[in-house]
Amino acid sequence: SHAKVETDEE
């Protein structure tokens, strides 16, 4: 959702 904030770029 953000650029590598908690590994939630899916």
UniProtKB/Swiss-Prot annotation:
Annotated localization: Mitochondrion inner membrane
CC annotations in GO: mitochondrial inner membrane
Keyword tRNA-binding: no
One record GO biological process: oxidative phosphorylation
Superkingdom of origin: Eukaryota
Pathway(s) the chain acts in: Energy metabolism; oxidative phosphorylation
Presence of keyword Metal-binding: yes
Coiled-coil parts of chain: none
Keywords per UniProt: Heme, Iron, Membrane, Metal-binding, Mitochondrion, Mitochondrion inner membrane
Membrane topology: Peripheral membrane protein
Molecular-function GO terms, alphabetical: metal ion binding
Function: Component of the cytochrome c oxidase, the last enzyme in the mitochondrial electron transport chain which drives oxidative phosphorylation. The respiratory chain contains 3 multisubunit complexes succinate dehydrogenase (complex II, CII), ubiquinol-cytochrome c oxidoreductase (cytochrome b-c1 complex, complex III, CIII) and cytochrome c oxidase (complex IV, CIV), that cooperate to transfer electrons derived from NADH and succinate to molecular oxygen, creating an electrochemical gradient over the inner membrane that drives transmembrane transport and the ATP synthase.
Similarity annotation: Belongs to the cytochrome c oxidase subunit 5A family.
Quaternary state and interactors: Component of the cytochrome c oxidase (complex IV, CIV), a multisubunit enzyme composed of 14 subunits. The complex is composed of a catalytic core of 3 subunits MT-CO1, MT-CO2 and MT-CO3, encoded in the mitochondrial DNA, and 11 supernumerary subunits COX4I, COX5A, COX5B, COX6A, COX6B, COX6C, COX7A, COX7B, COX7C, COX8 and NDUFA4, which are encoded in the nuclear genome.
Record's protein name: Cytochrome c oxidase subunit 5A, mitochondrial
